[in-house]
């Protein structure tokens, strides 16, 4: 992963997060989807000037808090470093149970793949 250059906007402010149920519902209603054994990522173009991230990790799927927190940290860090390339799209990341048994490098590679796929799919979603 590339190292951030100071002053280039690699922060993760509240404005870049999905927080309310209405914002999550907006993405769930008509989303582009990318899935693998560990993660499901939903995406939908927004009308803002930046991408936003929402995390939906259920205790039913990921039982231990330490595992949920590790996955959330990895997703936020991957998003933070890639946000300049992610377009004006809202993303919601959901984890599956097998995500707890895979190492962090594998999850980061999977996220990179999902970001790339969904950025292509959603930016071209206005045409059939």
Swiss-Prot record:
It catalyses: Endonucleolytic cleavage of RNA, removing 5'-extranucleotides from tRNA precursor. InterPro entries: Ribosomal_Su5_D2-typ_SF, Ribsml_uS5_D2-typ_fold_subgr, RNase_P, RNase_P_CS. The lineage of its organism: Bacteria, Pseudomonadati, Pseudomonadota, Gammaproteobacteria, Methylococcales. GO terms for molecular function: 3'-tRNA processing endoribonuclease activity; ribonuclease P activity; tRNA binding. It comes from the Bacteria. It comes from Methylococcus capsulatus (strain ATCC 33009 / NCIMB 11132 / Bath). Its EC number is 3.1.26.5. Consists of a catalytic RNA component (M1 or rnpB) and a protein subunit. It is an enzyme of class 3 (hydrolase). The keyword Hydrolase applies. HAMAP family: RNase_P. GO terms for biological process: tRNA 5'-leader removal. RNaseP catalyzes the removal of the 5'-leader sequence from pre-tRNA to produce the mature 5'-terminus. It can also cleave other RNA substrates such as 4.5S RNA. The protein component plays an auxiliary but essential role in vivo by binding to the 5'-leader sequence and broadening the substrate specificity of the ribozyme. The keyword Nuclease applies. Keywords: Endonuclease, Hydrolase, Nuclease, RNA-binding, tRNA processing. This is Ribonuclease P protein component. Belongs to the RnpA family. GO terms for cellular component: ribonuclease P complex. Pfam families: Ribonuclease_P (PF00825).
């Amino acid at each position: 992963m590339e190292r951030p250059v100071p002053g280039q906007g690699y922060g993760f402010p509240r404005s870049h997060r999905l927080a309310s149920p209405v914002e999550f519902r907006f993405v769930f209603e008509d989303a582009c989807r990318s899935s693998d054994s560990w993660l499901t990522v939903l995406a939908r173009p927004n009308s803002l000037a930046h991408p936003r991230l929402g995390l939906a990790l259920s205790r039913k799927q990921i039982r231990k808090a330490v595992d949920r927190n590790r996955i959330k940290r990895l997703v936020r860090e991957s998003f933070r470093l890639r946000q300049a390339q992610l377009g004006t799209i809202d993303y919601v990341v959901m984890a599956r149970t097998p995500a707890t048994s895979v190492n962090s490098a594998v999850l980061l590679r999977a996220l990179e793949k999902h970001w790339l796929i969904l950025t292509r799919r959603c930016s071209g979603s206005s045409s059939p």
